[in-house]
Amino acid sequence: MNEEFMKERPVLPLLLSMALPMILSMLVNSLYNIVDSFFVAKISEDAMTALSLVFPIQNFVNAVAIGFGVGINAVIAFYLGAKEPDKANAAASKGTLLSVVHGVIMTVVCILIMPGFLRMFTSNETVVQMGIQYSMIVFAFSVIISIDLSFEKIYQAVGRMVVTMVGLGGGCLMNIVLDPLLIFGIGPFPKMGIRGAALATGLGQVFTLLIYLFVYVFRPISVKIGRRYLHTEDYLTGKLYAIGIPAILNMALPSLLTTALNAILSTYSQIYVVILGIYYKLQTFLYLPANGMIQGMRPVISYNYGAGEHKRVRSIYNITLTIIGMIMVFGTVICLIFPDKLIGMFSDNQATITEGATALRIICAGFIGSSVSVTSSGALEGLGKGTPSLMISLLRYVVVIIPVAFVLSRIFGVVGVWNAFWVAELITAVAALFIYRQAVKRKS
């Protein structure tokens, strides 16, 4: 099998070779929402608010697709490391079919709930209607997103990171080109407003899938997808969900957090809801490189775990933690030096820029601490330990930050919400280190 390099190459060069294509592709992919926000902000402040309110549900759809993809990735890489290719093929085939099912369900559910969901956070009917227009189109592509992520994780499991980089990059470039054309009606294209932003995003995702399918057909990989594998290794469905469900919850929890914080912030002013939406778009530039490292690390740590290379597993964890810590230091410095310029990328409103700069300076105090929880949670997913990974994410996104944000907002006002971020990150970092060590010790 040509995946042997994952246990033979030195750890640092191996991690970088696996992670750098993912970091580049995820940085480019982060432009999906960034580009939408940039052009939508040119429409109106109401349009930007609508996009911010839809974001948690949009993020949930991605969470389901990515989270289940993590299960596909971990199971395939484990069986490749254990030299059981038939089981790897079955995992890929079953995982792809289940991803299609998930996409259909999410399309129906998300479109149905959006009107009521939007009215929970705003009484501005213009914002509600813009949110519905955007949602009806963007969620119609949920099946495409699910299949995209299934193929992405399969390619990652066999070490073909460049394929995912090209696929994600191609889709993003398509989105960047189509956004202004469809939003503002340039040339022969219709002027669709916020609906154009949604359609551009969906067509970009379709283009990504076409790239993946082209490579699968003309540049075959060691893992095969086929109907004949669907009726074998029935227990693998349970194994996929055993890792995938905690990973889905891990990915979905930020949406729950955003919804809860929007509810708190909306009691003060719509400006703060916009600021939170802008922050989450900005932080993608920081956390997506970190997540790119995790995506590069995950198949490597899973493969070596399946091959019984436990000392190498420890080395992979430690090196990944160090690199992610360096990324977070860089992000903290940038946010402290240029907060107003960063917020100003997405708003011309001086009040939003001023308040947003204050928020960014406070929130970034927790970036460095988050490197421990991000690395520990990702490593546990790669090792097939979904429950401990979920425990870390629950602490980070629900158990600590939401109560702290609520209490501090009652004492210090809106500034208390921003301070809740770094308080939660520091508490979670200590807990994550303990949970990771206990989970690894218990199994080894």
Describe each region flagged by the PLM.
Residues 60-63, 107, 175-180, 209-213, ...:
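Hydrophobic transmembrane alpha-helices of multi-pass small-molecule transporters
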Residues 17-36, 137, 171, 204-208, ...:
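Transmembrane helical elements of multi-pass membrane transporters/channels
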Residues 22, 26, 38, 74, ...:
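Transmembrane alpha-helix boundary and packing residues in multipass membrane permease domains
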Residues 48-108, 145-159, 163-164, 262, ...:
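Small-residue-rich hydrophobic transmembrane alpha-helices
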Residues 8, 12-31, 35, 57-64, ...:
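Residue-level signal for short hydrophobic patches within transmembrane helices
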Residues 1-19, 76-143, 189-245, 301-366, ...:
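Short alpha-helical transmembrane segments in multi-pass integral membrane proteins
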Residues 27, 31-49, 118-125, 181-192, ...:
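Helix-terminus/linker motif at the lipid-water interface of multi-pass membrane proteins
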Residues 69, 73, 138-156, 164-172, ...:
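Short runs within selected transmembrane alpha-helices of multi-pass transporters and secretion channels
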